Amino acid sequence: MNKLMLMLITFATSLLAQTNKASTGLKTDQSFNNSLSESVKLKEIADIYPTNTNFLTGIGIVAGLAGKGDSIKQKDLIIKILEENNIINEIGSNNIESKNIALVNVSLQVKGNTIKGSKHKACVASILDSKDLTNGILLKTNLKNKEGEIIAIASGITQPNNKLKGSGYTIDSVIINENQNINHSYNIILKKGNYTLINRIHKILTSKKINNKIKSDSTIEIEAKNISLLEEIENIKIETNPKILIDKKNGIILASENAKIGTFTFSIEKDNQNIFLSKNNKTTIQVNSMKLNEFILKNSNNLSNKELIQIIQAAQKINKLNGELILEEIDGNQN
């Protein structure tokens, strides 16, 4: 077949090199090999996140604003906050009346467990009428959980939060001073929801005696009490669905080992280059159930690359193709 550029790659983990003998030798970027692999590590198709998120908040004072702070309209409220935080003696009435301080809300979101001594970044927002908190000094502020327990202490220099495009400020020095109830639950979240795949992962975890529960087509909740177990889970090998990659432009077909084609009958008009014969010769092809790479090898001498691709696409449309069909152009000039 003159212009046929046919590549059959069967991926069965350790047999990759051997099965590549069925290829025409076209150089293809290794990333395509990886994309067709039927065995991947869990961390390649999913992320692991703690199930718990701790929200800590507190009301504090930013000082050193040099006339950019709150007006004296809320003087009584500011004094009350200073007294609650035991810093009333650090702030003189002159600072309140000269707009050098501002009443602020400090908030912190901690994903996972709050660990004593750990350092975090918090958001700071003006509560009253201060317009600019840049380079102010957040005085010691208690951050509490929803139960009212003091979990962290915040203080430091306020800086604009560029991620919020000019609105809001941050501080970098929030120290957790109390451990909360330690939670060992995590969610494995697939990058693309798939009930078959999520159930496959569930069975593997169960076989390894790892407590887990399917929550949706993309999420499994697990229990992991140490980092080493999380590392083991990240590196679990998962068998994914077979894949078939087709490059129509270059006439390339890549099929993973377990991709299969079912039984059906296909009618196609073959282009006949003999001028003495009919230019359009309709041919009926009986396709029997077999592995896709076997089907292509069996018919590569009788069918063109275009015809093979037509048959594969037709099989997909009538649910006779076991595998995910990917249409993509491959650069065969890569080394």
UniProtKB/Swiss-Prot annotation:
GO MF term list: structural molecule activity
Record InterPro entries: Flag_FlgI
Gene Ontology BP, a term: bacterial-type flagellum-dependent cell motility
Residues making up the signal peptide according to the UniProt record: 1-17
Any one of the GO CC terms: outer membrane-bounded periplasmic space
Keyword set includes Transferase: no
Keyword list, A-Z: Bacterial flagellum, Periplasm, Signal
Keyword Signal: yes
Cellular location(s): Periplasm; Bacterial flagellum basal body
Taxonomic superkingdom: Bacteria
Similarity annotation: Belongs to the FlgI family.
Role description: Assembles around the rod to form the L-ring and probably protects the motor/basal body from shearing forces during rotation.
Oligomeric form and interacting partners: The basal body constitutes a major portion of the flagellar organelle and consists of four rings (L,P,S, and M) mounted on a central rod.
Designated name of the protein: Flagellar P-ring protein
